[in-house]
A protein has these predicted regions:
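Residue-level detector of alpha-helix boundaries and kinks
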Residues: 19-22, 59-60, 89
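Short, surface-exposed beta-edge/turn micro-motifs
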Residues: 31-32, 70-72
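Short Cys/His-centered divalent metal-binding micro-motifs
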Residues: 71-96
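Histidine-centered catalytic micro-motifs
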Residues: 50-58, 75-82
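Short linker/helix segments within small regulatory modules
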Residues: 56-71
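A boundary/linker detector
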Residues: 1-49, 94-123
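Short glycine-/acidic-enriched loop or helix-start segments at secondary-structure transitions
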Residues: 45-46, 62, 87
């Protein structure tokens, strides 16, 4: 004979992962054009395989960038491999961070930005 398991009066609810808030980018339309190709070279051709780049990356800031819509779509050359790539060239990365902060400050204050991201990128 099988032993019957006692039923719990208050069964545990399964744990649910918190869903990340996905907001549209406030920096760029999702139109298939690399943000930096357009900005630096005036190239507005549509490209396939664009990467989503969170302007303020890193564990905590990536989530905040996603929630605030602070991300752009970049081609591989401007994201990772080229000389002007944001993960290679500090000047390009800083330019993008300043642009994102200025856009964020159109609807918020600088103090709110600093409180949220830990520092100001505008000198």
């Amino acid at each position: 004979m099988k032993k019957k398991e006692p039923e719990l009066l208050f069964p545990k609810q399964p744990k649910r992962r918190k869903r990340m808030k996905h907001k549209k980018s406030i920096l760029q339309e999702k139109n298939g054009i690399c943000f930096l190709c357009d900005l630096l070279e005036g190239d507005t051709r549509q490209q396939y395989g664009l990467h989503k780049h969170h302007v303020f990356f890193g564990a905590a800031n990536r989530k905040l960038s996603e929630e605030d819509g602070l991300y752009v779509y970049l081609c591989v050359r401007h994201h990772e491999t080229g000389p002007d790539a944001v993960h290679v060239n500090k000047g390009t990365r800083t330019m993008l961070q300043i642009y994102a902060q200025e856009t964020y400050e159109k609807t918020h204050t600088r103090e709110e930005f600093i409180k949220r991201y830990g520092r100001s990128y505008i000198q």
